[in-house]
From Swiss-Prot:
Root EC class: transferase
EC number from the UniProt entry: 2.1.1.22
Enzymatic reactions: carnosine + S-adenosyl-L-methionine = anserine + S-adenosyl-L-homocysteine + H(+)
Region (Disordered): 1-91
Subcellular location: Cytoplasm, Cytosol; Nucleus
Any one GO molecular function term: protein homodimerization activity
The gene coding this protein: CARNMT1
Signal peptide start-end: none
Gene3D superfamilies, alphabetized: Vaccinia Virus protein VP39
Assembly and interaction partners: Homodimer. Each monomer accommodates one molecule of carnosine in its active pocket, precisely anchoring the histidine imidazole ring such that only N1 is exposed and deprotonated for methylation.
pH-activity relationship: Optimum pH is 7.0-7.5.
Protein name, entry field: Carnosine N-methyltransferase
Length: 449
């Protein structure tokens, strides 16, 4: 990014915190505390030491000095202990980061085992039926064999993603044991991984185009309307997309010539976006079977095993000189520089907050005076009903009131923008969201410190 789009040090490629409800203590705060501890240790090192005795009562002078030294040093000891504790905290944080990185890598590698166990269970249950009932469905077991082949193919793609990502974020050492024993992954991690496979449909397949048109296109249209080429040098319009997922919205914005940065903190998303953005260039050269996990609501057996192809465009086809990047980390920790961004575009994002007011506060701070915030999405709060997790579930009315009290001016507001999210178009069950679209502007004269 240009100097105008500088972000804090934590925005550089570094291991982001675990996704959603499983976050570690903020690394930024611990690093700041560690710096304070080091400064205090340096203060101790600058304490005066006794000069060579030149006469009088050397032993008395030395004892007097030692007594005074004890008095001077004693108040420093709690600080030294605190500094040592902070060092231990940072070491623990790094250990947790390595463990989280390896846990997600393991989930990618465990996918095939997990899915084969699922299919094997279905086969056992089918074979427990009376023989006359089994004979009514001669294609059932061959269909399961087809699913097994799809699983193996998906695992090959996931292994390719893993092979590339073990060296991401300067964490090469984290991947050195990547060929080690695969251990069972949690149900939570496997659900996240299966959901990530559907993100390829949403962001990088032809099948996902209607969904992108419903929620990405309104954002892009507002960007073009507010930053027209007649009045703006696109390359100097700095746009941030928090919660960028696999990066398609940010990529589309950069494709128009704007300087765009996507931000994401889920390793499932970051590993996958790294693969599609940096390793895929030929259109529709890759294939996935994202619907094989869905054993219910299939009209036809073939619907379950149909493939999707990606990417539907060449991610490397950005115009020469384009300014497009992705950062890894927590949105609130990374972006702290006041008055930096011309536009912030959030899509299905604000309900990922523990406290959506924190998101609003960060957006207000980092937007330039006169900058705009464009939002599309529902309010399906991700931490609702999770034990031991802060979750403030506000209505849109409440959110709107908070936005106005911060000082934003509402320029566009639509309360029923119909959209889906990673929908299976052939499924017998679909979820539709009536999303809110709004465009709000930070006044020129306002600057929040």
């Amino acid at each position: 990014m240009s100097a105008a789009c500088a972000v804090s040090r934590e925005a550089q490629p570094a291991l982001p915190p675990p996704p959603r409800g499983d976050r570690d203590p903020p690394a930024k705060a611990m690093r700041r505390g560690l710096r304070r501890g080091r400064e205090e240790e340096q203060d101790q090192e600058r304490l005066p030491w006794p000069a060579e005795s030149g006469g009088g009562d050397p032993e008395g002078e030395q004892e007097a000095w030692r007594s005074g030294e004890r008095r001077r040093r004693q108040p420093q000891e709690p600080r030294a202990l605190a500094a040592a504790a902070r060092v231990e905290e940072e070491a623990e944080e790094e250990r947790m980061e390595r463990e989280h990185f390896r846990r997600i890598i393991n989930a990618f590698r465990y996918y095939g085992t997990n899915m084969h166990e699922r299919v094997n269970r279905t086969e056992r249950q089918f074979k427990s039926l009376p023989a006359n009932q089994q004979s009514l469905l001669p294609q059932f077991l061959p269909h399961l064999d087809k699913i097994r082949k799809c699983i193996d193919h998906n695992q090959e793609i996931l292994q390719t993603i893993v092979n590339d990502c073990v060296h991401m974020f300067e964490n090469k050492e984290y991947g050195e044991d990547g060929g080690g024993k695969i251990t069972p992954a949690s149900t939570f991690d496997m659900d996240k991984l299966k959901s990530t496979l559907k993100q390829f449909v949403r962001d990088w397949s032809e099948e996902g185009k209607p969904e992108r048109d419903s929620c990405y296109q309104p954002i892009i249209s507002e960007i073009v309307k507010n930053f027209p080429k007649e009045r703006w040098d696109f390359s100097k319009v700095n746009i941030l997309v928090p919660g960028a997922g696999l990066g398609r919205l940010a990529w589309e914005i950069a494709m128009l010539g704007y300087a765009c940065q996507g931000n994401e903190w889920s390793l499932f998303m970051l590993f996958s976006s790294n693969f599609v953005l940096n390793r895929c260039s030929e259109v529709n050269s890759c294939k996935l079977y994202p619907w094989i996990h869905q054993f219910s609501n299939n009209k036809r057996s073939a619907d379950q095993i149909r493939p999707i192809y990606f990417p539907d465009v060449d991610p490397h086809s950005l115009p020469s000189g384009s300014n497009f990047s992705m950062t890894a980390g927590d949105f609130q920790e990374i972006y702290s520089e006041c008055n930096t961004w011309d536009c912030i575009a959030t899509c299905f994002f604000i309900d990922t907050a523990h406290n959506v007011i924190d998101y609003i506060d960060t957006i207000w701070k980092i937007l330039k005076p006169g900058g705009i915030w464009i939002n599309v999405g529902p309010l399906l709060y991700h931490f609702e009903n999770l034990a031991n997790e802060l979750s403030i579930e506000l209505s849109y009315e409440d959110i709107k009131n908070v936005i106005l009290q911060y000082g934003f001016h509402i320029e566009v507001e639509k309360e029923s923008v119909l959209s889906t999210y990673t929908v299976n178009e052939l499924s017998m069950m679909k979820y539709y969201y009536e999303c809110v679209l709004f465009v709000v502007r930070k006044p020129e004269e306002k600057c929040f410190e």
